[in-house]
Structures are given as C-alpha cells and as structure tokens.
C-alpha cells in the first residue's frame, strides 16, 4: 500500500491535535495505507511558547504546564530530512480543511509546511497539500510554491484516499502513475494552470470517522485549561456554518461548493441543510467513549463552527447517550449568542459542556448588517 508522511508545521509550542491530521490518518489507515507523522510543534528552533506568552497577558490562568513539556533541541530541518530518508514516503502532505479553521495556526499551515520542506531532498516523494489557500487561490499557491506537485481544494479526505488508492493500483501493475484525472485537484502542467472538476462535498461524515488520535504523541494531548493541565483533543461533531459573515474564512469553503447566496435578512446561506452536516449521535458517542476510556482524555475541545446550529435531534440523542454513560469528560464549544436560551443551556449541561466561547461584534447595527453580513437580535 502507499506510504504517506504527514508534516505538522505547528509553531505554537503547545498541545494541539489538528483535526485534519486525525481525520485523514483515520480513513487512510482503515484502507491499509501507511501513515506516519512528523510533528514540528515541540522543536525549540521552530516553535514559540504560546502558553507562556498568553499567561503573561492574563489570557490563560497560571499553571505548571511547562513542567509537562520536553522541547527537542535538534535542528528541525535535519530531523525532518532524516525522517524522509528513513520512511521514504510516496507522498508528503501538510495542510487540509476541517472544522479547525478559525485559529491556532491552521490557516498558515500551507506556508509553514512549505518552508520546512522546500529545501530538503524529498527523494521521489510527491508533494501535495490542501487547506484554505489551496481552495481559494490555488494557482497563486502553485506559482509561488512551485515545488508542490498537486493541491486539493475543499475537503480532502476522500480525494486523498482516491489519490493513494490510484497510486497503489498503478504501482502494483507496474504502470505509470497518472493522478491528473482525479476530481478536486489542481496542478501546473507545461507552465499552464490546470484545475479539475470540483469533488462533491462529504455528505456523510460517518464515512470518514472514527478519527485517528493515536497518531499524536502524549505531549500533543496536554494543554492548560482553567488553571489546570488536562489531557485534551480537538474534535468535530459537524462541518459547516449556516451563516455567511463577510469576514469569516468559512465563506471560502461555502463558495468552493457553490453556496453563494444568502438571506438578506439573516445572513444564512440558502440550502444550508446541505452544507451543515453532522456525524450521527452513535458515531460521536463511540469516538468520545474511546477517547475517554482508552486514552484518558478529559477535555473535548469542539471546533464546530457554531455548535448550537447542529442538528438538535442528534444533540438530544447524544445527550441521552452521554447521560446514561459513565463518561468523565468536559466539552468546550463555540457558538453564537442568539442560540443561548433556557432550553439550550439545559441541553449543554446534559452534554457535559463546561465552557462556551462566543464572539460579539461591537459595531452599530447598520455597519454590522451591510458591511459584515452579520445579523443579530439587538434585544438578545
């Protein structure tokens, strides 16, 4: 089967389990491909100490988080080169889209990963990657980062699987490998930009679950939370947001999949039920059960774009499954203020939600609606 090296170019110097790594690794391993990870997070010559900086700024409560960490003093480029020589991957991949798009370095992965790889000897490895920039400005990226062989626009789990399956099939037949007919990819050929037909959106998220969190080392599972150090993972129960705020990177993905129209009264995209997709309650619960009981995960950091717009029936089913279980977890979510009411608070409690993050735009109503495409009930 095909061999692929994931490179995590995270520069934050703290535990993050990037969802794209877990989602892509899971489906590739279940299809018998070999996946390994080179994680640059804890290299002293690469990463910053984000926790120390934010603690000093009073953004985080004081903890002894640093006592749990061991930074690698080796040269990150030397170690990555060694990994490539030892593993000899068919593909190298370092950026992709998931719900984890709004911060924590996801949007700069493509640049940081390329900076790590561009001057190394990749042997015969094929360089391909995805993410927001690959989706919104693929030709610019390919012209600027000219050592990249292929880009994947939009959600890339199934496209990457098709690429590896196709490669493996051709390799087993001793045939020449031609990946240029696969939907969802773009590339430069004879100095001309080629963008293939877009792949379909992943309608059934259960197809790409469960995600592979075993690929991360223990340091990546640790993070500060409310004055304590806990074992945590970044997680998604859904993908997509029903709203189309002009300042949000979510609109890049919406436009890629042709969700171009929105309501002038609410800012919600038309046909949003086809864009906002949820895992089944059973699949979510099974993942949570494994993480809590097998990996001792305490905190589930949900990166769902707007948690309270998720399918309410699925959330109710999940809350019942959690309520009847002996799960010892806390869940942190992000949502919009207008979704908060007595019923939703009761539901969040039953789901073991411990923290809620919300954003509020401090601007007058006219500017917010006309310039930001953000609508909210002033009274609420």
Predicted regions and their residues:
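A short helix->loop->beta-strand "cap" motif at the edges of active sites that frequently abuts
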Residues: 2, 122-126, 148, 327-329, ...
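Nucleotide-activated donor-dependent transferases that construct or modify glycoconjugates
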Residues: 2-13, 97-98
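Hydrophobic/aromatic residues located in beta-strands of well-ordered beta-sheets
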Residues: 4, 127, 182-183, 300, ...
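Conserved beta-strand positions
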Residues: 6, 94, 129, 153, ...
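Short beta-strand/turn micro-motifs composed of small residues
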Residues: 8, 39, 131, 335, ...
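Glycine-rich beta-alpha loop elements in corrinoid/cobalamin-binding modules
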Residues: 20, 24-28, 34-46, 68-201
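Charged, often glycine-rich, active-site loop that binds/positions anionic groups
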Residues: 45-73
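Radical SAM [4Fe-4S] cluster-binding motif and immediate context
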Residues: 209-380
């Amino acid at each position: 089967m095909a061999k692929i090296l994931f490179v995590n170019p995270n520069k934050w110097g703290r535990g993050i389990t990037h969802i794209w790594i877990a989602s892509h690794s899971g489906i590739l391993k279940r299809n018998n491909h070999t996946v390994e990870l080179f994680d640059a997070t804890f290299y002293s010559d690469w990463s910053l100490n984000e926790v120390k900086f934010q603690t000093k700024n009073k953004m985080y409560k004081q903890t002894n988080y640093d006592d749990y960490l061991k930074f690698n003093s080796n040269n990150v480029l030397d170690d990555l080169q060694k990994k490539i020589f030892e593993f000899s991957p068919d593909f190298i991949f370092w950026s992709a889209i998931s719900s984890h798009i709004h911060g924590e370095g996801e949007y700069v992965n493509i640049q940081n990963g390329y900076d790590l790889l561009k001057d190394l000897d990749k042997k015969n490895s094929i360089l391909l990657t995805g993410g927001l920039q690959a989706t919104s400005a693929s030709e610019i990226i390919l012209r600027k980062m000219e050592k990249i062989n292929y880009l994947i626009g939009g959600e890339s789990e199934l496209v990457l699987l098709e690429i590896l399956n196709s490669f493996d099939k051709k390799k087993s037949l001793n045939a020449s490998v031609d990946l240029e007919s696969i939907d969802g990819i773009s590339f430069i050929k004879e100095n001309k930009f080629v963008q293939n037909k877009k792949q379909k959106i992943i309608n059934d998220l259960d197809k790409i679950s469960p995600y592979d969190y075993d690929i991360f080392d223990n340091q990546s599972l640790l993070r500060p939370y409310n004055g304590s150090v806990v074992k945590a993972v970044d997680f998604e129960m859904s993908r997509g947001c029903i709203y189309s705020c002009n300042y949000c990177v979510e609109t890049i993905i919406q436009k890629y999949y042709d969700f171009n129209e929105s309501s002038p009264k609410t800012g919600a995209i038309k046909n949003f039920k086809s864009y906002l997709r949820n895992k089944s309650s059973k699949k979510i619960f099974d993942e949570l059960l494994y993480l809590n009981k097998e990996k001792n995960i305490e905190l589930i950091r949900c990166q769902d774009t707007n948690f309270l717009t998720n399918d309410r029936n699925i959330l109710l089913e999940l809350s019942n499954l959690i309520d009847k279980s002996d799960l010892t977890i806390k869940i942190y979510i992000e949502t919009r203020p207008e979704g908060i009411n007595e019923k939703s608070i009761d539901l969040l409690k039953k789901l073991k939600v411990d923290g809620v993050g919300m954003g509020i735009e401090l601007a007058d109503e006219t500017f917010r609606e006309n310039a930001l495409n953000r609508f909210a009930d002033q009274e609420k």
